Amino acid sequence: MLRLCFLLSFMCLVKSDTDETCPSFTRLSFHSAVVGTGLSVRLMLYTQRDQTCAQVINSTALGSLNVTKKTTFIIHGFRPTGSPPVWMEELVQSLISVQEMNVVVVDWNRGATTVIYPHASSKTRKVALILKEFIDQMLAKGASLDNIYMIGVSLGAHIAGFVGEMYSGKLGRITGLDPAGPLFNGRPPEDRLDPSDAQFVDVIHSDTDALGYREALGHIDFYPNGGLDQPGCPKTIFGGIKYFKCDHQMSVFLYLASLQNNCSITAYPCDSYRDYRNGKCVSCGAGHIVSCPSLGYYADNWREYLWDRDPPMTKAFFDTAETKPYCIYHYFVDIISWNKSVRRGFITIKLRGEDGNITESKIDHEPSAFQKYHQVSLLARFNRDLDKVAEISLLFSTKSVVGPKYKLRVLRMKLRSLAHPDRPHLCRYDLVLMENVETFFQPILCSKQQM
């Protein structure tokens, strides 16, 4: 709540409504947020035929909405400035580009715009009732609940849940993008989004320590970077307004990345972020569907597998890069050492591709214990995926400021890609790593016995 309060102090004036040829998202001013707004919901339809010019529709006039097609509703959340969401247009265009569908923007800016968050929160059920009235008319015209998909951002995620509850969980799918936490944390299932609200509920948690919901809410819950501080977002209040909203918005930007085919973000089901970082959760156990779940639009490839689980809920973790397309590429670095005594320390690994590109991973979340003839498997994360690795460097460090410098004697090092398990494993034998000295070498193909 503290971050939410600070957010309000950074609000700046935005432009008021103006007449436009094509209907667009309601644009209000900060003055509207201060004096408050009554609830008014506009439904704006976009199709492949009308991708940039919306058509305002309602329960008595469905317009050009094709009830035989998939219909995706986008529901925004709290708007303390009255301005349109910066991501809305891109999300609409990206959805239409991947599949022929109806995209309906649920514009409840008159209602969500207020500096008093509880006032916006109190209107969520009213918005849900309006959406149910509209969907009832869709069903009367021949639509199927199976083809209804709701993407809810922040408060919008709970609105989607309330709609799903009114249809006894028969909606096709709900995606919650960092569902709002304040006033919803700890509430019973009927007062928030939960897995029973749709046939498939997937959730991305990106700001669990401030504006987002802490606990799992779906059949599968994704936690980028543990669901806390997101790379690329300001770490202090000196980052201005971005400090307060960047982590919260990152769920939307990560979802957008899944629609844009720059890379596929893979997540790893795990009990905790710490276990994931320690490399304990890289086998997903669902090879008959996909090796591991993908974040975002294609997360429902895992729905049948999750339905068979008891309970049908899974947490999945992954890390991201600071900038688009946010992908991190995972490798295992398997090290067998032959020191007489245990060596504890950290490994930094660099890869150089045949094209000259270099990428680095610091495996430093906690020290590893290297014991004689025991294999230590380290999960390394790189911002770049190198198809052909020409050179590898390793650096061993105990991070000790005083005391002797140690050696790590490596009997065998093996590098294997998790994203591309079909790639050949690369090895190197009989290395001596001097502490804090980078050691370069050319890898060779591992023998078949060690694949």
UniProtKB/Swiss-Prot annotation:
Keywords: Cell membrane, Disulfide bond, Glycoprotein, Hydrolase, Lipid degradation, Lipid metabolism, Membrane, Secreted, Signal
GO cellular component, one term: extracellular space
UniProt protein name: Lipase member H
Family the entry assigns: Belongs to the AB hydrolase superfamily. Lipase family.
Record-annotated disulphide pairs: C233-C246, C270-C281, C284-C292, C427-C446
Catalytic residues, chain numbering: S154 (nucleophile), D178 (charge relay system), H248 (charge relay system)
Pfam families: Lipase (PF00151)
Subunit and interaction comment: Interacts with TTMP/C3orf52.
Segment forming the signal sequence: 1-16
Source organism: Rattus norvegicus
UniProt catalytic activity: 1-hexadecanoyl-2-(9Z-octadecenoyl)-sn-glycero-3-phosphate + H2O = 2-(9Z-octadecenoyl)-sn-glycero-3-phosphate + hexadecanoate + H(+)
Enzyme Commission number(s): 3.1.1.-
A molecular-function term among this protein's GO annotations: phospholipase activity
Family matches, as PANTHER family: LIPASE, LIPASE MEMBER H
Enzyme class: hydrolase
Locations listed in the record: Secreted; Cell membrane
Domain of life of the source: Eukaryota
Annotated membrane topology: Peripheral membrane protein
Job of this protein: Hydrolyzes specifically phosphatidic acid (PA) to produce 2-acyl lysophosphatidic acid (LPA; a potent bioactive lipid mediator) and fatty acid. Does not hydrolyze other phospholipids, like phosphatidylserine (PS), phosphatidylcholine (PC) and phosphatidylethanolamine (PE) or triacylglycerol (TG).
GO-annotated biological processes: lipid catabolic process
Glycosylation sites: N66
